[in-house]
Amino acid sequence: MIQSFTRLNVADNSGAKEIMAIKVLGGSKRRYASVGDVIVASVKKALPNGKVKKGQVVKAVVVRTKKEIQRENGSLIRFDDNAAVILDNKNEPIGTRIFGPVAREVRYKNFMKIVSLAPEVL
């Protein structure tokens, strides 16, 4: 459950380390984002030689949340942190590597490039 002003770790090598959610995309009064949802975010912490800079506004897809996700088979899955992957204008990841596990719900939202780069899909 990601909403405005939520801080998320960045799970790729785009150069950003932490982002803060500004808006949840999809719907005019949409409040929460879960795994697989796209958000607009501001970069709060970044590496000096990265592709994105501090203060830059980016789009990102949520790949892990602390709030549990209910699957269709009744099982629940939750992660230790809130994490996202930064996207470009064509909804492709900016980074070339993904760190940490990624939820299977990302595949259902057609982010296949993220799923193929991820070391583990849970």
UniProtKB/Swiss-Prot annotation:
It comes from the Bacteria. The keyword Metal-binding does not apply. Keywords: Ribonucleoprotein, Ribosomal protein, RNA-binding, rRNA-binding. GO terms for molecular function: large ribosomal subunit rRNA binding; structural constituent of ribosome. GO terms for biological process: translation. One of its GO terms (cellular component) is cytosolic large ribosomal subunit. SMART domains: Ribosomal_L14 (SM01374). CDD domains: Ribosomal_uL14. SUPFAM superfamilies: Ribosomal protein L14. PROSITE patterns: RIBOSOMAL_L14. The keyword Metal-binding does not apply. HAMAP family: Ribosomal_uL14. Binds to 23S rRNA. Forms part of two intersubunit bridges in the 70S ribosome. Belongs to the universal ribosomal protein uL14 family. Part of the 50S ribosomal subunit. Forms a cluster with proteins L3 and L19. In the 70S ribosome, L14 and L19 interact and together make contacts with the 16S rRNA in bridges B5 and B8. NCBIfam families: rplN_bact. This is Large ribosomal subunit protein uL14.
